[in-house]
Amino acid sequence: MELRKDKLLMFYSEGKESKEAKWAVNDPMSKSYKLSLPSALRPDNLLPGNRLRYTDASKSKSSKVSWYKTILDPGSEIVLKWNWVFIVSCMVALFIDPLYFFVPAIGGDKNYPCARTDTSLSILVTFFRTIADLFYLLHIFIKFRTGFIAPNSSTRVFGRGELVMDPKAIAWRYIKSDFIIDLIATLPLPQIVIWFVISTTKSYRFDHNNNAIALIVLLQYIPRFYLIIPLSSQIVKATGVVTKTAWAGAAYNLLLYMLASHVLGAAWYILSVDRYTSCWKSRCNGEAGQVNCQLYYLDCDSMYDNNQMTWANVTKVFKLCDARNGEFKYGIFGNAITKNVVSSQFFERYFYCLWWGLQQLSSYGQNLSTTMFMGETTFAVLIAIFGLVLFAHLIGNMQTYLQSLTVRLEEWRLKKRDTEEWMRHRQLPEELRNRVRRYEQYKWLATRGVDEEVLLQSLPTDLRRDIQRHLCLDLVRRVPFFSQMDDQLLDAICERLVSSLCTEGTYLVREGDLISEMLFIIRGRLESSTTNGGRTGFFNSIILRPGDFCGEELLSWALLPKSTLNLPSSTRTVRALVEVEAFALRAEDLKFVANQFRRLHSKKLQHTFRFYSHHWRTWAACFIQAAWRRYKRRVMENNLTAIESMENEEGEVGEELVVVEEEECVEESPRTKMNLGVMVLASRFAANTRRGVAAQRVKDVELPRFKKPEEPDFSAEHDD
């Protein structure tokens, strides 16, 4: 025991293991059973006496592995949650990047405008862009630590395949596939261009800053947008859908459409600024005068330069480039200049450009009036193409998601229409049609068009059992007949219960019909009646409420030691008074449950069955009624016997006094006459009563008693 407790091994000098070592290694109950010999022979495991302490390799390995070296399962919960977080961060990053297009702006006054850079906006956008880049960097790290399913593994024939957890194989596969795209999407290229490239080449900033920013952002925007596609595919493979609700899916597609409008509006803005400054440059290069035009004069940083101020007073560049004069054709960019969009505050610029982009995408650019400038016409063509594709994509996906909200309702409407056509074709009477309509309506309200039985049968057995237990256990325990059973038997019952719905006026079973299931009422009321009382004119009716059951003839049949295949007949007619929800135990399932009943050996269960059985209740009521009648008859017989004895005694006394009565007949008092009349009436009543008792005895002999229900066998286990 001491060796087993400490898990110690001893090795002989010639290299043979001792019996103790073999015992410890071969014992499956020992923690050392999973360990290999090399892990036990490490020097740090040595103990005095040439003994080694056997440690749990799994625990020591897990304790030494750091969190950043852990390999993740691509289908695990943490990877799925990260994919959701990353796809949200990607959407935010895609909205942030086009904001760089609003950094170039037009400053100065109306008469002497100049090109400027919105520094405060640059700082703000750079800050949020850097945070978004950190999410991309973290995503690269997670992909280096996420396993994958072997593509050529033979295990993919069945199941999902073999999961590769080797860090080197994971890294090599990632580098060969998506690493380059992820790296390009992660690089902070706009920050580098704005804060390092343009700042160091200040003299050339006016010529190149707009084009450089637009080019860098657009080139990096493509791989960033591409990352959303495989990410959405991974979420769909793992969960089946991108969004959990239809409204979220519709909002997601609408957000993508707004993103396209956002990008289009930002591109239109920077092209408008570029078109405006291009006019300045062309007029500046062609201007000749006392003061030559220099390109840096057009920059707001040189506004306080003496030469620039002298040139601004005599130049005609700004007048010739004014969109109101019509000297220079701006085409689709004219509104940005005439409405001072390029010189407004950021929020004014942004929302106007967003509206312009949304308007052009929705109208496919039909209201655009372009010039002969090739760049402008190309931009208009792209607007028409992307507008058509994106709008069709939006409408299609929105329709799909929104239709999924009412797909069940639409199926029910189609089924209802088909049912109406069928009833009209078969010329069913209005009463039957109303019953069919009520049943379909009630079934829809109860299930919302979901076939619960098919849904549960498609799930694994263990999961189906847990769901049935959650749905049925509390309701089953409300039935007193089931409240006496243990949890194991209740689980078996819950697993076999099926829901049953009945509308008002429905006959669940009629007297004499075969019984195929036993019902346990959850909600509603049923009327159970019978005319089989053993005599003509017998009628008994009771109301079954939640907690009651009907069809116990099937239980008595199932509890028979050798029950036949023929189902029993119903002795009662059961009709729904209102809408009823119940659980049903079918005959084959009840046979299994009945076999479990026998193993309980419970008299209490037998008494509970008697108490809540309407057959036993009816028999008990008839039995008590018959006993009460017998008691009343005995009391009446005793009273009549006493009256007859009194009559006999009075008769003897009357014969002895007959002579006296005759002599005193003339002098008879009114009181004597009254006594004599009472005696005559009493004798007549006694005679009639004797005849009634005799007739009642004959009647009791002729009328059979109400048949006692069969006693279900709960106490013994029988061999098949």
From Swiss-Prot:
**The organism sits in which domain of life?**
Eukaryota
Subunit structure, briefly?
Answer: Homotetramer or heterotetramer. Part of a functional complex containing PSKR1, BAK1, CNGC17, and AHA. Interacts with AHA1, AHA2, and BAK1, but not with PSKR1 or BRI1.
Name the record gives this protein = Cyclic nucleotide-gated ion channel 17
- Does the keyword field hold Cell membrane? yes
Q: Which gene encodes it?
A: CNGC17
Q: Where is a nucleoside 3',5'-cyclic phosphate bound in this sequence? A: 481-605
Domain notes for this protein = The binding of calmodulin to the C-terminus might interfere with cyclic nucleotide binding and thus channel activation.
Q: What GO molecular functions are on record for this protein?
A: calmodulin binding; cAMP binding; cGMP binding; voltage-gated potassium channel activity
SUPFAM superfamilies per UniProt: cAMP-binding domain-like, Voltage-gated potassium channels
Which ranges make up the Extracellular topological domains here?
Answer: 107-121, 200-211, 274-377
